[in-house]
């Protein structure tokens, strides 16, 4: 069975962009692939984190993984820092990665822009991501457009290692959704919906209450026209709302356009809010039914399964690089 790896950072509230762009896809994959899904807490540390919030967010994210429909009996669900091989392999990969390669990473340029100081961890983040993927000899990685460049680096580093030390790593392939992989901000639909945005109205969080969901969607930025159509260049706000409606209902976007043809933006927003509230209510009920003890048990078992695979890969890498193994 082909293997899939992906992860989400526990660095803030999980929103519908995370869900529609990645997490929902995870559920569809669990029956056909050997799936490793990770709460990547080490990645979160590349920017300052409140320790109490980080712990809370880690538990919350793991519970949401389960609440959206991931079955711990079918997938390996674990926390990145619980498997130390991630950090160790990241260092080994840094030693064969070139400074220029990391300097060209668009995400580093964006996140470090205008800041007086940034962490080395933010700069070397792509090597930790590469380690996450390569440790499990992953075949496919569900990634958004913003991570595509990092996956290309992962492939380059893996191929370089294989050429230099002998066949070791599987060269992973991206699994990118052609439609809906990038959900945009409700307040600025030219930017991606983000949990790091200072304006909480830019996103609908999975655990938002119905009144908050309704308010955020009704306030979503649109345009001065009145025609409902998909046009990302001229009507990014409406196009974003149509996309969200399509993904939550399973309707083709053309069907959604026809459904609301001749109607006002307010009608689209109102019905979209009702759809989102209805869909998220199921996730929220599942979330409330999961205890912290159950989450910790699942994470412990997942880490044990992940570590069993990771240590074998790390051992192989060390041997090929000439490191002496401890008995």
UniProtKB/Swiss-Prot annotation:
Disulfide bonds: none annotated. L-tryptophan binds at residue 132. It catalyses: tRNA(Trp) + L-tryptophan + ATP = L-tryptophyl-tRNA(Trp) + AMP + diphosphate + H(+). InterPro entries: aa-tRNA-synth_I_CS, aa-tRNA-synth_Ic, Rossmann-like_a/b/a_fold, Trp-tRNA-ligase, Trp-tRNA-ligase_bac-type, Trp-tRNA_synthetase. Its EC number is 6.1.1.2. SUPFAM superfamilies: Nucleotidylyl transferase (SSF52374). ATP binds at residues 9-11, 17-18, 144-146, 183, 192-196. One of its GO terms (biological process) is tryptophanyl-tRNA aminoacylation. Its main location: cytoplasm. It comes from the Bacteria. A motif ('KMSKS' region) lies at residues 192-196. Keywords: Aminoacyl-tRNA synthetase, ATP-binding, Cytoplasm, Ligase, Nucleotide-binding, Protein biosynthesis. A motif ('HIGH' region) lies at residues 10-18. It is found in: Cytoplasm. Belongs to the class-I aminoacyl-tRNA synthetase family. Catalyzes the attachment of tryptophan to tRNA(Trp). This is Tryptophan--tRNA ligase.
């Amino acid at each position: 069975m082909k293997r899939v790896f992906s992860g989400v950072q526990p660095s803030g509230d999980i929103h519908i962009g995370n869900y529609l762009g990645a997490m929902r896809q995870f559920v569809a994959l669990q029956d056909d692939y050997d799936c490793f899904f990770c709460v990547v807490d080490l990645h979160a540390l590349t920017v300052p984190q409140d320790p109490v919030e980080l712990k809370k967010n880690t538990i919350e994210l793991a519970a949401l993984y389960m609440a959206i429909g991931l079955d711990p009996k079918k997938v390996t669900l674990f926390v990145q820092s619980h498997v130390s091989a991630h950090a160790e392999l990241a260092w080994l990969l840094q030693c064969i990665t070139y400074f220029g390669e990391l300097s060209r990473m668009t995400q580093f340029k964006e996140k470090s822009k205008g800041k007086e100081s940034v962490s080395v961890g933010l700069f070397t983040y792509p090597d930790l991501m590469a380690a996450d993927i390569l440790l499990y000899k992953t075949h496919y990685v569900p990634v958004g457009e913003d991570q595509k460049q990092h996956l290309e680096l992962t492939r380059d580093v893996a191929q370089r290692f294989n050429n230099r030390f002998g066949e070791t790593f599987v060269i992973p392939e991206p699994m990118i959704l052609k439609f809906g992989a990038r959900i945009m901000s409700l307040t600025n639909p030219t930017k991606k919906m983000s949990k790091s945005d200072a304006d909480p109205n830019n996103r609908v969080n999975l655990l938002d209450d119905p009144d908050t969901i309704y308010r955020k969607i009704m306030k979503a930025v649109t345009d001065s026209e009145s025609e409902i159509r998909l046009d990302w260049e001229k009507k990014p706000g409406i196009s974003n709302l149509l996309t969200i409606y399509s993904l939550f209902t399973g309707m083709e976007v053309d069907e959604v356009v026809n459904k609301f043809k001749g109607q006002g933006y307010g009608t689209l927003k109102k019905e979209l809010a009702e759809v989102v509230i209805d869909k998220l209510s199921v996730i929220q009920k599942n979330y409330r039914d999961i205890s912290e003890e159950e989450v910790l048990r699942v994470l412990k078992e997942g880490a044990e399964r992940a570590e069993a695979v990771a240590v074998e890969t790390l051992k192989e890498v060390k041997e090929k690089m000439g490191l002496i193994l401890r008995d």
